[in-house]
Amino acid sequence: MTLSGSGSASDMSGQTVLTAEDVDIDVVGEGDDGLEEKDSDAGCDSPAGPPDLRLDEADEGPPVSAHHGQSQPQALALPTEATGPGNDTGAPEADGCKGGEDAVTGGGGPGAGSGATGGLTPNKPKNSLVKPPYSYIALITMAILQSPQKKLTLSGICEFISNRFPYYREKFPAWQNSIRHNLSLNDCFVKIPREPGNPGKGNYWTLDPQSEDMFDNGSFLRRRKRFKRHQQEHLREQTALMMQSFGAYSLAAAAGAGPYGLHPAAAAGAYSHPAAAAAAAAAAALQYPYALPPVAPVLPPAVPLLPSGELGRKAAAFGSQLGPSLQLQLNTLGAAAAAAGTAGAAGTTSLIKSEPSARPSFSIENIIGAGSAAPGGSAGGGGSGGGAGGGGGSGGGGGAQSFLRPPGTVQSAALMATHQPLSLSRTTATIAPILSVPLSGQFLQPAASAAAAAAAAVQAKWPAQ
């Protein structure tokens, strides 16, 4: 009550007294804490103005609460809240001071780090290596042209590229296979075998003489076109002449692509007409432009056949001077020539069937008939040329029988027909089914050749009169 009554006389003095008492009594440890916080704030080099204002506000706070009386704890709570945040923010401010120093040092740290990285970037040599703008073909060409002998091995080419370009020196094992592939797949590079007296490993590689203008104006940066090697004409002619000198059984014919180890043109020309062989050779030359020329045919050309009229005239002229067996053979060959002309015109190519009933069966009638027909058989040699009489018919039948047999048994059939003549009825019945069989030209050509040879021998021995 005394405090409220004396408040009007001396407000300022009462306020100061109340403030001191309140601070000394009610807030015992907070004043000291505030001072300590002030000292700590001053130690952090913070401005002293805001803490002084806070203390003044704390000093001015209690008179307002004193007039209300019971609201002193609430009035005292305001400075405590004001000082409370001060207490709470004191440590962060101190920490902030330290954090500021750390921020300064930390800021200097990244700056120094960036400066260090900026200083190390131009010192790295690997980033400055750039791949040369040359292709592998250009690099190989450079290596070969700079060598004294104008040829290098694969290892020599790789060594030149590594010494000349640092980029390839750093990546040496990766591009060696690329060099090897370009050497083997491009026609502008030619492989040269190593000499026997030159020790070492690997073949030499050189440039094709025709690939000198492969690059534009001598610059290795640009290539005109892909080089393709063309085989020279004179080399092919020399190879053809050399292989043709081996004959029909040459190595080329044995290693050809024909069905039986022959070249297609040789296989076609060996067993066909000359025109067909020429056509086949032309087709093979078009299909295989680098193939060897066809070799000579394996079989010799056939002997030309004599006309049947001329052969019959010569046989009639020499018939009187020859023996019976030779006359029978000449007559048989004349009939063969005539039959050959007929068969060639008709174009029959069927084979001769076997004749099991060609030979007569052994019986008494055949023996009796042979004894009675012996004179007719002897006259059959001349009768076959004249073409009349029973004996002549029998002789003609024997000749036909001997002709229908293979050419190897012509002489044996002729002798059998001479020593064992047949009767007219028996011969006709036996030969009738044989004559109905169409003739084949399989054995006509050898028979004609034998006829021509026999005629030449007879003419040389007995000249025509």
Swiss-Prot record:
SUPFAM superfamilies: Winged helix' DNA-binding domain. One of its GO terms (biological process) is positive regulation of transcription by RNA polymerase II. Residues 1-18 have a biased composition (Polar residues). Expressed in premigratory and migrating neural crest cells in the early embryo and in motorneuron and interneuron progenitors in the developing spinal cord. GO terms for cellular component: nucleus; transcription regulator complex. It comes from the Eukaryota. Residues 1-127, 375-405 are annotated as: Disordered. The keyword Nucleotidyltransferase does not apply. Its main location: nucleus. Keywords: Activator, Developmental protein, DNA-binding, Nucleus, Repressor, Transcription, Transcription regulation. Residues 21-39 have a biased composition (Acidic residues). GO terms for molecular function: DNA-binding transcription factor activity; transcription cis-regulatory region binding. Residues 130-221 bind DNA. It is found in: Nucleus. The keyword rRNA-binding does not apply. Residues 105-118, 377-400 have a biased composition (Gly residues). Interacts with POU5F1. Binds to the consensus sequence 5'-A[AT]T[AG]TTTGTTT-3' and acts as a transcriptional repressor. Also acts as a transcriptional activator. Negatively regulates transcription of transcriptional repressor Rhit/Zfp13. Promotes development of neural crest cells from neural tube progenitors. Restricts neural progenitor cells to the neural crest lineage while suppressing interneuron differentiation. Required for maintenance of pluripotent cells in the pre-implantation and peri-implantation stages of embryogenesis. This is Forkhead box protein D3. It comes from Mus musculus. The lineage of its organism: Eukaryota, Metazoa, Chordata, Craniata, Vertebrata.
